[in-house]
């Protein structure tokens, strides 16, 4: 303990549980989360990295610690040193050599001491602090933050209001039966961050202004910057050999191909349809509009360039499970980020048969593990990791051909898994099936039936215009005939989709529908990356003018529809 120091509790709270818990296991878990995810505590921080006990850096930090704090923690229990890596902020005043030294002073008490090697400001907490728990009952834990008595209270306001809240949330949500995957667990985190910053600033950020796609440019661009950085670090760490040529299957906007080319990896992208950005910003990138038929590869016929030795699948949908299969036939490595669940010939169904008995997992978890099992059956050396990208689907599968080769009977294994069925590629043009293609006469007939019911549901009048009532969708659904339902089902839609598409007639909100009154505009959250659209005059006739007994509520001059 720091000689002569006393500690005081600055904030504490009790967490209650429904059954008896293991306090030590819970405490160790939150300490682990606290050290590993400082970026969840402070937006100044990108990540943290554990310092190796056998390194020169470990000894340098401890020497600086001893000089600064006047005691040596080398003999303390479970001593750890964590490097805190800050975000690359403008006018940065934070240290590039910031660390936290921590140790268990008691079984349920950990001390934390900040250290910098360059004298600059620490990006995390600048004063020593402690995390502890008490055990009031068998089913509760009292979480505490402590500070040294002589430390200024001002230094700990953020800890009291924000940091403690996050730590308490972790404590309440702990499930020791579940194992959590760590982010970028296969990589040197510090090296990854340097690579990511380089790709983002040198190649990514400048593309935001010229973005022509409908997606959010910052999310799309920074996500692909993260994926490109990850693949680069896999190669640098020898987890994957540098490819002679890669192919990004289902490359979408093509940005990942562009970024990988920029950092020195040769390769191209394939997608069933081109994107607008291919002809503008990415006109010099090798992006090919063509369908991918994995069964051509399975039949040993040429489909990709002959020197391709890395297959990439980034949200490749129905081709996802085929990528390990095609890689096996080509005897090459693959990198895969599964997203929408597909099996070899359609939507994936979670029957859990490959997971073993009594395992309950989500559709995505089952699909992900099934895809891993496909790669393992083919004999790949498989590794799994979690990417640091702005996406809900960020688990990746890395498949490498082992030195001894893949399984000896690749063709038999593939035939066994695919059962001789035929793959159906996605069409180039995707048919719109959202109830808009219901024949006009049927669409107007159904709309009129629903309109009359909503209008007569209430006698309410707003400024001289009968506005009808707010009707639960379940009541409106009861009005539909079997023929009506079939028309909607054939368009992959239902009642709610139908009503939303009759925008000038109905407003749908929280499982109810009412008549649209354009005098009462609905405020919609506009996507920040899209410019505000000018009001347009529609060619469709005004429904209210034709069918409402009081006519159009806004009048011919102000109405956006034809009168």
Curated annotation (Swiss-Prot):
Keywords noted in UniProt: Cytoplasm, Metal-binding, Methyltransferase, S-adenosyl-L-methionine, Transferase, tRNA processing, Zinc, Zinc-finger
Localization in the cell: Cytoplasm
GO MF, any single term: tRNA (uridine) methyltransferase activity
One example of a Gene Ontology biological process annotation: tRNA methylation
InterPro entries, A to Z: SAM-dependent_MTases_sf, tRNA_uracil_MeTrfase
Pfam families: AdoMet_MTase
Protein origin, superkingdom: Eukaryota
Zinc finger residue extent: C3H1-type: 536-563
Family in the record: Belongs to the TRM44 family.
Name of the protein: Probable tRNA (uracil-O(2)-)-methyltransferase
Natural source organism: Caenorhabditis elegans
Native organism taxonomy: Eukaryota, Metazoa, Ecdysozoa, Nematoda, Chromadorea
């Amino acid at each position: 303990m720091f000689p002569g120091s006393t500690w005081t509790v600055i904030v504490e709270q009790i967490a209650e549980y429904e059954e008896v818990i293991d306090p030590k296991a819970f405490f160790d878990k939150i300490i682990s989360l606290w050290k590993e995810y400082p970026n969840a505590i402070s937006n100044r921080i990108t990540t943290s990295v554990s310092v190796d006990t056998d390194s020169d850096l470990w000894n340098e930090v401890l020497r600086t610690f001893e000089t600064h704090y006047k005691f040596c923690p080398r003999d303390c229990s479970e001593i750890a040193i964590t490097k805190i890596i800050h975000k690359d902020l403008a006018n940065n005043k934070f240290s590039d050599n910031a660390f936290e030294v921590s140790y268990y002073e008691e079984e349920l008490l950990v001390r934390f001491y900040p250290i910098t090697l360059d004298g600059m400001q620490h990006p995390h907490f600048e004063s020593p602090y402690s995390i502890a728990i008490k055990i009031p009952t068998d089913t509760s834990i009292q979480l505490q933050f402590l500070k040294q008595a002589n430390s200024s209270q001002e230094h700990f306001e953020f800890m009291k209001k924000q940091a403690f809240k996050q730590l308490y949330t972790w404590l309440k949500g702990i499930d020791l039966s579940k194992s959590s995957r760590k982010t970028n667990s296969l990589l040197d985190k510090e090296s990854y961050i340097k690579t990511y910053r380089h790709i983002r600033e040198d190649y990514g950020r400048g593309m935001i202004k010229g973005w022509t796609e409908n997606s959010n440019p910052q999310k799309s661009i920074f996500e692909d910057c993260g994926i490109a950085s990850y693949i680069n670090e896999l190669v640098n760490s020898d987890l994957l050999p540098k490819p002679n040529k890669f192919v990004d299957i289902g490359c979408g906007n093509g940005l990942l191909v562009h970024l990988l080319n920029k950092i020195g990896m040769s390769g191209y992208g394939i997608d069933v349809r081109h994107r607008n950005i291919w002809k503008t910003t990415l006109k010099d990138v090798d992006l090919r509009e063509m369908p991918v038929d994995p069964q051509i590869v399975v039949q040993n016929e040429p489909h990709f360039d002959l020197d391709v030795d890395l297959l990439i699948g980034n949200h490749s949908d129905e081709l996802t499970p085929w990528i390990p299969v095609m890689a096996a036939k080509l005897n090459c490595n693959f990198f895969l980020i599964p997203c929408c669940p597909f099996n070899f010939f359609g939507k994936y169904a979670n029957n859990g048969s490959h997971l073993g008995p009594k395992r309950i997992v989500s559709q995505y978890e089952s699909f992900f593990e099934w895809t891993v099992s496909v790669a393992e059956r083919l004999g790949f050396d498989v590794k799994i990791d979690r990417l640091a990208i702005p996406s809900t689907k960020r688990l990746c599968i890395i498949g490498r051909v082992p030195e001894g080769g893949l399984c000896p009977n690749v063709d038999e294994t593939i035939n066994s898994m695919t059962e001789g069925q035929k793959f159906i590629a996605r069409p180039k043009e995707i048919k719109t099936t959202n109830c808009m293609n219901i024949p006009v006469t049927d669409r107007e007939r159904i709309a009129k039936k629903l309109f009359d019911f909503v209008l007569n549901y209430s006698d309410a009048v707003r400024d001289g215009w009968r506005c009808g009532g707010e009707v639960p969708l379940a009541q409106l659904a009861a009005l539909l005939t079997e023929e009506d339902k079939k028309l909607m089902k054939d368009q992959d839609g239902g009642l709610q989709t139908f009503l939303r598409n009759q925008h000038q007639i109905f407003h749908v909100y929280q499982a109810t529908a009412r008549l649209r009154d354009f005098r009462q505009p609905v405020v919609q959250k506009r996507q920040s990356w899209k410019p505000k659209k000018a009001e347009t005059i529609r060619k469709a006739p005004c429904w209210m003018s034709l069918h409402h007994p009081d006519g159009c509520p806004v009048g011919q001059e102000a109405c956006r529809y034809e009168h």
